From Swiss-Prot:
Species of the source: Caenorhabditis elegans
Protein name: SURF6 homolog gldi-11
Bias kind Acidic residues: ranges: 133-150, 161-175, 182-194
Record's compositionally biased regions (Low complexity): 95-106
Biased composition (Basic and acidic residues): 107-132, 151-160, 212-221, 286-305, 427-443
Region annotated Disordered, chain positions: 53-73, 89-232, 249-350, 414-472
Keywords: Nucleus
Family stated for the protein in its record: Belongs to the SURF6 family.
Principal subcellular localization: nucleus
């Protein structure tokens, strides 16, 4: 008996596995899970993804990136078996039955209502054809009039149906427009079917009269702790859509920003006139002040000229002690004047800069000699002196100064300097010799030319005399 029972159980297990493998071939969307299961799966995925991310990452990441992350973490069930296993574990969805998808059937009453609406719209359009308003404005006005004519109960029903339609249509769209709701997931479990879903808690349009109230409601929902949930995000998206529609209606009706009336235009013109008059008055005042200043300066000049002619000191001089062309200088005592402050011996010893290499070598040798003399008397004092000198030199170098205390380099520099001096001297002598030689050659040439000219004149005269027969 036990063997037969085990064989039956094995056969049942094999059959179950085969059935599950066949079930897994059916897509999750086509299986027929009800909307509660789909919504809870979606909520589970969102909550698990949000747990993995920080607040900043949630805001910065797009819906597509979040979907990729969910797939990477294995939060999206790909087969029917995975969904069934999850549902068997959860308390809410322990009893699972596939749901048949039924196409929505239009009621005759609804059809009649729609026909009546169409007839009314056509009549009103024909009546308003003479007006210059566009067809879009006419249709929007007709809809508003119909809403006012209908009873309150019908109006409420319409609002509920429109809210449901907006939820189903715009539930995934506002992510693209406003970035508030998550985009529709590519996974089959996240795709919403045409079956009626649970109505979300939305704010009625009647309560939101102005855009300010809509903004307040959006702010309230965003400040809520559970603002990451899809329901609240849908509500925010709907509110934003309402606000946008209201703004579009206002623009179409022409109730935009307030236009400038004739009274306002007059007021603005008056203000401009007053400003212009004020600026003119200020300009006149400034010119008058400048004129007064010039007159006062001329008067002072006149008084100074008169006082100098009479030999009296001018008023200005008495006040400040300065006249325009006479300045008084305070002469210091002869002791202080021309007396220069001598630099200390220590500072002079440290001043090892410049190109006077001879004096620099002398300074370095002198300091070395003094240190050697001190070392003979007190070696400790000599070491202290050396350390002090080293520190002072290093500090000077750190400050950007130069300390030329290397004897070998100084001697080389001196030799180089002397060589340069000799070279320049030689160069100058050569230049002088050359100029002297050129000068002498030019002078000799000039003398030669002059002598030649004199000789030519003499020859010409002698030839003339010879021709005349005066000279044999």
């Amino acid at each position: 008996m036990a063997e037969t029972l085990e064989a039956v159980e094995d056969a049942v297990d094999i059959l179950e596995k085969e059935m599950l493998s066949f079930c897994n071939l059916i897509p999750v969307n086509s299986w027929g899970f009800d909307d509660d299961v789909k919504e809870s799966l979606k909520m589970r995925k969102h909550s698990l993804v949000n747990r993995q991310l920080s607040k900043k990452e949630r805001k910065s990441m797009s819906a597509q990136q979040k979907q990729h992350l969910a797939k990477g973490l294995g939060l999206v069930p790909n087969t029917v078996q995975e969904v069934l296993e999850w549902m068997s574990k959860s308390k809410q969805h322990s009893k699972v039955q596939p749901q048949k998808v039924v196409a929505p059937v239009k009621r005759p009453a609804d059809q009649n209502k729609n026909k009546e609406k169409v007839v009314k719209k056509d009549q009103k359009k024909q009546d308003k054809k003479a007006d210059s308003d566009s067809e879009e404005d006419d249709s929007s006005d007709d809809e508003e009039k119909e809403e006012t004519d209908e009873p309150v109960a019908k109006k409420q029903k319409k609002e509920e149906s429109s809210d449901d339609d907006e939820d189903s249509e715009d539930g995934e769209e506002p992510e693209g427009n406003n970035g508030a709701v998550e985009a529709e997931d590519s996974d089959s479990t996240d795709e919403e079917e045409e079956t009626p879903s649970k109505p979300n808690k939305t704010v009625a349009q009647s309560t939101l009269k102005s855009n300010g109230k809509i903004d307040k409601e959006i702010q309230k929902l965003e400040d809520d702790e559970d603002n990451e949930s899809p329901e609240i995000r849908r509500q925010i998206a709907l509110l934003r859509l309402q606000k946008k529609l209201k703004e579009m209606k206002v623009e179409r009706k022409g109730k935009g920003p307030a236009k400038v009336t004739s009274a306002m235009a007059e007021k603005m013109a008056e203000e401009k006139r007053l400003k212009r008059r004020e600026s003119k008055l200020k300009l006149k005042q400034r010119r008058a002040e400048e004129k007064k200043g010039k007159e006062a300066a001329a008067q002072v000049k006149k008084e100074t000229v008169e006082s100098t002619e009479n030999g009296n000191e001018p008023v200005e001089k008495q006040k400040s002690g300065i006249s325009f062309n006479n300045l008084k200088f305070e002469i210091k005592e002869d002791k202080q004047r021309g007396k220069k402050q001598r630099t200390a011996k220590k500072d002079r010893a440290l001043k090892l800069t410049g190109r006077d290499y001879k004096s620099l070598i002398a300074k370095v040798e002198e300091t070395k000699a003094t240190i050697a003399k001190v070392r003979e008397a007190d070696p400790h004092k000599a070491t202290i002196m050396e350390d002090e000198l080293k520190w002072e030199k290093t500090l000077k170098r750190a400050a950007g100064g130069k300390v030329k205390d290397n004897l070998g380099m100084l001697k080389k520099a001196l030799v180089k300097k002397n060589k340069m001096k000799d070279r320049r001297k030689q160069k100058w002598e050569n230049r002088e010799n050359k100029t002297e030689g050129e000068k002498q050659t030019k002078q000799d040439k000039r003398k030669k030319n002059l002598q030649k000219r004199i000789d030519d004149v003499k020859k010409r005269k002698m030839n003339k005399l010879r021709n005349k027969g005066r000279i044999l």
